[in-house]
Amino acid sequence: MDKEKEQDSLLDIKVGISLGDINGIGPEVVLKSLMDNRILQGCTPIVYGSVKTLNTIRKSIEGEEIFFNSCKDATEARRKKINVVQVWDEEPEIEYGKANETGGKYSFLSLEAATKDLAANKIDVLVTAPISKETIAKAGFQFPGHTEYLADLAGQKEALMMMVAENLRVALVTSHVALADVSKSLTREGILDKIEVLNQSLQRDFGIQRPRIAVLGFNPHAGENGKMGQEESETITPAINMAKGKDIIVNGPFPADGFFGSVALHQYDAILAMYHDQGLTPFKALAFDEGVNFTAGLPIVRTSPDH
């Protein structure tokens, strides 16, 4: 395939973008990304929101002028244009940095419209900007986060939150769960399901034929043979052994505190952490500027900025 045909093929990819909270960082990040001309060479972007709202926010940030192609529907999107599906016509009041009902309402409207088009195959990929979980819930959003919402829409029980950088992939067994509830959320079957989803995603989405997966423990020092907790011996290790019985290359549980500073980090294709901060704190320390949040286990591609 020559370069011209390759670029032509890339432009066939319609990337839907939900704005996130209009009072937050989401629209700014979206607009600054769209100012990079490479975007229009690699896909056809479709933002779900309003030209008026985007122009208002555009005035508050530095950078080149942006010209939008207003669409009633994603099918009207044009190549080499920054397309905006008009989800609303009114001009909501924007209060930067404030978590309020307005931000929640319009973040949900944008997300609903984008996911509706995704389900109808009008877009090929979904990129979601950050939401305020507190305010979007007041607008009727009944899920802990994007990952759970998209899994429900796709009818997938075991979607997996995974942070991805060039040389680092970290997935989570539990994601938006209170720390006090993590232990009782861990089951052998649940951990096994997450290992299987991660293994399949590494094969299908990342082209790794025989992935190597490291699983972290839950307690300090991975339980120290039961002296600091039973989760490793009663739940995590049995799940790992069950996965090995399914011909998955997986090892652990490794003590989480030292793993990310050890040689072992580079011997695996992905790490499976037990809970949100256990996996995301070291990931963001090592790869915050390049990290992407990828939802594994879905029949579609969904990403968001590391945040």
Predicted regions and their residues:
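Ligand-binding beta-strand-loop-alpha-helix segment within the catalytic cores
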Residues: 163-192
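A generic local secondary-structure boundary/capping motif
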Residues: 73, 151, 159-162, 203-205
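Contiguous, glycine/small-aliphatic-enriched amphipathic segments in soluble metabolic enzymes
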Residues: 2-146, 189-274, 278-292, 296-307
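Short, flexible loop segments at boundaries between secondary-structure elements
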Residues: 152-168, 298-307
